[in-house]
Amino acid sequence: MKDKVVLAYSGGLDTSIIIPWLKENYDLDVIAACIDVGQDDDMEAVRNKAIKTGAVKVYIEDVKEEFVRDYLFSAVKAHILYEDAYLLGTSLARPLMAKRLVEIAHAEGAKYIAHGCTGKGNDQVRFEVGVASFDPKLGIIAPWRIWDIKSREDAIDYANSKGVEVPVTKEKIYSNDKNIWHVSHEGGDLEDPKNEHKSSMYFMTTPPEKAKDEVSYVELYFEQGIPKKLDGKELPPVEMMQTLNKLGGENGIGIVDMVENRLVGMKSRGVYETPGGTILYAAHAALERLTIDKNTAHYKQMISQKYGELVYDGLWFSPLKEALDAFVEVTQKNVTGSVKLKLYKGNVMVAGVDAPYALYDEDISSFGASELYDHKDAEGFIKIFSLPYKIKAMIEKEKGN
């Protein structure tokens, strides 16, 4: 009886050629596991392709609900970005996928997990750290670090030699990752940063200049940092994301073209579409500005940066990330209320916020008189606040500086 390997399978170029390669080079029974995080693929076609290519069994695992509820909404509450721009769509999906791969490996008695991540990318780290977090005894097979295939052109040639149908050509060679949160585009002419990316590559988004000429309004209601209602209607997490993606996509929202610092040390360029996520981030940030005090808000910005780095680096299941979650939860206890946004040709603008726990008081913040704040009080405050700088100036003057 052959040993088994569970392959993280998408039906794309890399994982399609890995099935025959594993059978040839390891003599293993290949179990293909497609973890559905909202790719919008024809899953029956994915299943049939895996079997046709040589898999002995195929798992199609729909984890969209868990992905949105436990991963994406956690990202919204923490307001995480990588290098101030990337909403971490790929990074957020990998820990859940790794967890499910381990569960399938245990159910099947498999000794190995295989993936199609390249030896230059971040995903190899994310998958393997995720697997090790649940079962460090499982073996890892990473073909891109082993085989003689050195480029996507080589991979296409190998696929053709094995009669494997793949969804790319040497002329259309972008590498894409899609889920319910985003689409990423890498490779091809994007590798030269002088090249403007082509809007024809977009999957989820209308180019801003071609978006509709009318303004769209949307109102989101949050409870303790979690989006619950859209335009007054309570929606389950997956439907919430699907609706926001459609609305954001129609209005050209959420396109990012950036050069980022990969975990493995090199820089890479990616184009990201995150229409619904960009809307959620804008609404949540507007609500936080009214409901979180200054010191906590400023400290949370530092926490958010570190949290984003942990997620990017594949450390979702780390003790530090668990500790940061505890901090974030406390900050969200009063982040409840409604945010109205205006969407227009790639722009998201706040059009009103209503929060029952708002720390903003119109009477105090206005230029008029207030029982809690007398304009004359500012004079004493300024004297105390500026005291260190007065002392510094006096000392420098005495020394002749």
Curated annotation (Swiss-Prot):
GO terms of biological process kind: argininosuccinate metabolic process; L-arginine biosynthetic process; urea cycle
Protein localization: Cytoplasm
Residues that bind L-aspartate: 118, 122-123
The protein's assembly and partners: Homotetramer.
Name by which UniProt lists this protein: Argininosuccinate synthase
Signal peptide range in chain numbering: none
Molecular function in Gene Ontology: argininosuccinate synthase activity; ATP binding
Chain residues that bind ATP: 8-16, 116
EC assignment: 6.3.4.5
Gene Ontology CC: cytoplasm
UniProt organism field: Clostridium kluyveri (strain ATCC 8527 / DSM 555 / NBRC 12016 / NCIMB 10680 / K1)
UniProtKB keywords: Amino-acid biosynthesis, Arginine biosynthesis, ATP-binding, Cytoplasm, Ligase, Nucleotide-binding
UniProt: L-citrulline binding residues: 86, 91, 122, 126, 175, 184, 260, 272
One Pfam family matching this protein: Arginosuc_synth
